[in-house]
């Protein structure tokens, strides 16, 4: 749920309860810096719900590994073997680059949306595979396809719940 820092715990609790009771939602992803998942799990209405924590560690390590940063093997192994059942693993999310962007851009290019390129994180750990943005070069497009496949391999090989951003499965 996209709650912000100013959201009170009681409002978060009321919203999640509503989704469970009215729409029979059986799980949520929450930012542990905004609300404590353990506190949510104590609520009688939410007790049987799956409450997963959003944490960028897996995303950042895997992106750095995919783009070839040195010294990442140990971190990759630790992330792949992490068995925290409250975490979910992802390489792309609603906040930042899509998987296709990760292999197509070295930096943000959000100038056209009116936010002066200030939206989304500045640290995307991305690599454009030899050409910034869309490319028709066969070597670049093939490398990008391989990198996307590698990302899915790492994601699905990891322990825990994999999360794929809607649309990323199409490349």
Range-by-range predicted roles:
Residues 24, 36-166, 170:
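Conserved alpha/beta catalytic core and glycan-binding cleft of carbohydrate-active enzymes
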């Amino acid at each position: 749920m996209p709650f912000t820092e100013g959201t009170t715990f009681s409002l978060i609790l009321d919203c999640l309860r509503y989704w469970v009771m009215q729409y029979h939602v059986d799980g949520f992803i929450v930012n542990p810096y905004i609300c404590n998942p353990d506190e949510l799990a104590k609520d009688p209405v939410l007790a049987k719900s799956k409450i997963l924590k959003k944490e960028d560690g897996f995303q950042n390590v895997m992106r750095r590994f995919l783009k070839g940063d040195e010294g990442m093997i140990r971190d990759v192994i630790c992330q792949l073997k992490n068995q925290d059942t409250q975490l979910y693993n992802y390489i792309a999310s609603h906040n930042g680059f899509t998987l296709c962007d990760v292999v197509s851009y070295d930096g943000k290019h959000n100038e056209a949306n009116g936010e002066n390129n200030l939206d989304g994180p500045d640290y995307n750990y991305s690599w454009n595979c030899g050409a910034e943005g869309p490319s028709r070069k066969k070597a670049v497009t093939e490398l990008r396809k391989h990198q996307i496949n590698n990302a899915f391999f790492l994601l699905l090989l990891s322990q825990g719940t994999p999360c794929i951003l809607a649309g990323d499965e199409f490349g």
